UniProtKB/Swiss-Prot annotation:
It catalyses: a 2'-deoxyribonucleoside 5'-diphosphate + ATP = a 2'-deoxyribonucleoside 5'-triphosphate + ADP; a ribonucleoside 5'-diphosphate + ATP = a ribonucleoside 5'-triphosphate + ADP. CDD domains: NDPk_I (cd04413). Major role in the synthesis of nucleoside triphosphates other than ATP. The ATP gamma phosphate is transferred to the NDP beta phosphate via a ping-pong mechanism, using a phosphorylated active-site intermediate. The gene is ndk. This is Nucleoside diphosphate kinase. GO terms for biological process: CTP biosynthetic process; GTP biosynthetic process; UTP biosynthetic process. The active site is at 116 (pros-phosphohistidine intermediate).
Length: 138
């Protein structure tokens, strides 16, 4: 089934000039880029995006990290895009990352793991709508 999912290239990766390399890797692995933008999130935007995590121990450090440098948001499309992109991203925990995954290749640590991806089709729809209007997705 053809799906769309949201990808974020996080501040640790944009700061190290890895945007092109990561986007190319996504495309080489069967994910088409249907929308793309670079932005510097505000605290309010970040808190809104991660609202489901408000009150958790990692919330404030996550917000601070995500506003520290620009990010890139992209709509990816492909066969089972949500699941396939999550497999391509790799595990959040550094010790569980497998060779060939974006986080193994480019992640620096637990939070500084280069990329974000929607965890379900429902999340993908919500997250895509958070950053893109329908007319921005081709």
């Amino acid at each position: 089934m053809i799906q769309q999912t949201l990808a974020i290239i996080k501040p640790d990766a944009t700061k190290r000039h890895l945007i092109g390399e990561i986007l190319s890797y996504m495309e080489k692995n069967g994910l088409a880029i249907k929308a793309l933008k670079m932005l510097h999130l505000t605290k309010e935007q970040t808190e809104g995006f991660y609202a489901e995590h408000q009150g958790k121990d990692f919330f404030d450090p996550l917000v601070a990290f995500m506003i520290s440098e620009p990010i890139v948001v992209a709509v990816l499309e492909g066969e089972n895009a949500v699941e396939n992109y999550r497999l391509l991203m790799g595990a959040t925990k550094p010790e569980e990352r497998k060779l060939g995954t974006i986080r193994k290749m480019f992640g620096l640590g637990y939070r500084e793991n280069a990329v974000h991806g929607s965890d379900s089709e429902t999340s993908a729809k919500r997250e895509i709508a958070y950053f893109f209007t329908p007319s921005e997705i081709v």
